């Protein structure tokens, strides 16, 4: 089976800066946690942010991520992260 992602949050985040593992986790078929690569972040106003999880306004952020398992199976995901004041 290819790797799978899971969001680590329930509900809204507060404005601030986060680590990837605060928000999204990935595992391989044997449930080993995998490194996640941040591809891009789009803020609620459509701005493409630098490669960091820095949420400075309320709204929905679109976070594109990628992971790869030991068998070189790659999986991409786009996760919508709601941020509230």
Where are the regions a protein language model picked out?
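Solvent-exposed, low-complexity, repeat-rich "mucin-like" stalks and linkers
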Residues: 1-35
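Generic structural signal for short, solvent-exposed loop/turn connectors between secondary structure elements
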Residues: 13-19, 51-53, 84
